[in-house]
């Protein structure tokens, strides 16, 4: 630049000394000077033009710099606005994540409270089961005590039966002694014929003894009548022994009274098989004694003379024996009274235990139904909670993915912003240098010089300032699980928590199935004797006996006990069909329906009264309650059957009919083969409407299970014990004749 200015000074000094004045003499030199002057003038003009263009260019450059700075400011504002928007979006996302976290925390807390309530309910159920176990153990102990008492009663009854057998044997021996006192051989032979006939009758009755207990009692009454006939014959033969006969009658009164007591004991202990066997043994002994009696009667004729001397001794012995027997009878009466009181106490205890067992089974049924309902509800709630947890996990995973995407986007945006800021810093530095260069160029610039050689490389600049700390990076993937550490020491027991708030009462459970029917009650005391029956038909005429001696008229005997009614006879065969009757006179010409009034007007739907019609079938909905077999027999007596449900429409119609009326039997059972349900006609069900969890064949762990089906509330099917008492539904085909008025 200095060289240029020096040249310009030299040129100026050369030109301005003589500006077209002193060059007249030298022509060539003048021409050269004028050319130089003209060139200098042109140079000045060019310099002025250059300065003007440079000024214009500088103005344009300044305007462009102003535009660039304005654009930088607007871009900076836009970036700041975008950054604020991004920060607000991040805050909104953080708020939403916090709200979702709070919602998840509340749901988890409610879930924990529900789990605690479930645990409390399970704990209560466990306590109830322990209580029921205690009650069952007590019942088992009471059952064992009852078994011991029953064994004692059986032993006492065995001893009583043995005593009765001994008394019967003594009485038979006593009758044998009395029979040995007969003297008149002719009368004894006639009596023997009667005895043989009665013996044949007794043998025939003994053959029919094993059929029923009623025939056995009739046979005993026949034997008693034969003994009374024999005693009357002895009274007619022996007029001298009237006093002895009165004593015998008194003894027989006592025996009849004793037999009545024995019959009462037999009715009270009807289920005692040992007593029945003892009665059979006594009857067999009586048969043997009767057979021996026929042999003894043959020897009576030889022994009669010897017995005359022993009559007085026998009378004394008989008096002593009477006293002994009266004392023994008094003792037996006292023992029987004690036994009766013991039996009454035992029966009351058994009835009390049976009632207690019924209540316990009903309670167990209620507990079972409540447990099943609560378990089903809890299972539904757990399934719903599992589904909600799965949804929460999916939502949390999606939120995590969105957060990761937002973080990656933020990182990219921040990196882009950092790059843009660096670029803007560089642009600002360049603009600053340009502005400095523009401020230095104050004077008019000179002409551009030649390009100089490249200078040496300058030293490195100082290191820049340390940048700000970057944001926290994304969490890395989880590392592998470490080895399990040693178990730590057991911590101290925590403090007992405060009592939680009482939970809301649960919803009312479904109605449980009815309990099993109780055991049959004990047989009651025998009722008072009924009125005297009518005289029976006359028996067959016996063979004529020998003419006996005329005896004295004896005292009227004590009326014997009333005999039991006989078995109903076998119905006879139907008689032959009679000949057709003559035709009747012609009637008036009116229809038969108008001539006779029907006894019971059938309904217009073709069903009997109290029956309902549906799809060409009649249905009977019972008001009374029966067990399954009784309900089946009732329907069969009505020429129908227990209902068979074949489709959903029939099920819905029956459901509407029985709503709010309890449980009803249907004709479905698996009694033939377990878990193979069939209708009573043997067909498999094509349509079912079981309650959830049914049939469960619940049998309390003992005895037969639930083998009969019925309808419960809402028309659902459930399995019951066949001994349960329910209503029932009968079904039969519609009588089409009633529809047409036939």
Curated annotation (Swiss-Prot):
GO cellular component: collagen trimer; collagen-containing extracellular matrix; extracellular space; membrane
Keyword terms of this UniProt record: Calcium, Coiled coil, Collagen, Disulfide bond, Lectin, Membrane, Metal-binding, Receptor, Repeat, Signal-anchor, Transmembrane, Transmembrane helix
Record's keyword annotation contains Coiled coil: yes
Biased segments, Low complexity type: 502-522, 532-556
Cytoplasmic side: 1-37
Membrane topology classification: Single-pass type II membrane protein
Family annotation (SMART domains): CLECT (SM00034)
Transmembrane spans: 38-58
Segments of skewed composition (Pro residues): 475-492, 571-589
Residues that bind Ca(2+) 3: 694, 696, 706, 718-719
Coiled coil start-end: 71-101, 271-334
Positions contributing to Ca(2+) 2 binding: 670, 674, 697, 706-707
Segments on the Extracellular side according to the record's topology features: 59-742
Positions annotated to bind Ca(2+) 1: 644, 646, 650, 731
Record flagged with keyword Coiled coil: yes
Collagen-like domain span: 467-526, 527-586
Tissue distribution: Widely expressed.
PANTHER family, per the entry: PHOSPHOLIPASE C-BETA-2-RELATED, SCAVENGER RECEPTOR CLASS A MEMBER 3
Function description: Scavenger receptor that displays several functions associated with host defense. Binds to carbohydrates.
Name under which the protein is recorded: Collectin-12
Organism: Gallus gallus
Lineage: Eukaryota, Metazoa, Chordata, Craniata, Vertebrata
